[in-house]
Amino acid sequence: MIMKKIINIILLAAAVLMAAGCELDNYDAPQGCIYGSILDAETGKPVPLPVEGTTGAIVSIMEVGTGATLAQSFYAKQDGTYRNSLIFEGDYTVTASGPFILQGSGQVTVNGETRCDQSAVPYSRIEMNVAQDGMKGTVSFTVTPTDDSYKVKKTYILWNYRKQTDIQNGNFAGSKTDFTGSKTGSHTFNFENEVQYKNNVDKIAENGNKVYVRVAAECEGRVNYSEVYELTLNNN
């Protein structure tokens, strides 16, 4: 008799859980989408960012008028854009954090696909020029801090066999980093002599012999980036 009661209780609990699951399944899926760019307040162009991930730029949205106390956060891409297709329609405040000073938070009504750009000032802007000669690539740079009081601590010239490139381990294959305090500089990579090129030559060949270069500059404890430049190597 006791065993029968236990079985009945278990069956009842299972039925309750199944009913609750059915109720959850009846909720409509999110129909909203927010997308946009973190735009340089002066140039109007997207701010180049670190690789998308935990060490990159974060966009946070908070629903307004619902009593929500927890923001929903997601990562911006290294080209300065972002997109989140898993939100409900409604009113939101939008903020972002990264190697820039955000020019106030935004407020947007999400209705279907909704654009919401953010205005920001990076700590520095980086101009990069690349000249190629067969298997060699010469990268030159100019770093311009956005405030006269900002000092450039260190500058990096990076290359990678994937487009996702920044100063974090695993996000670059080779680098030239002895530009301490420099606002200008250049370096020539002879890729066929680079150890990581030799170690990853098959991957590079599968990707059309492409490698990617980028400049990073540390200023006020934050690292800003140039855009990523693609090189197609000619080893003939």
Mark where each language-model region is.
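Short strand-edge motifs at loop-to-beta-strand transitions and within beta-strands
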Residues: 80-82, 114-116, 185-193
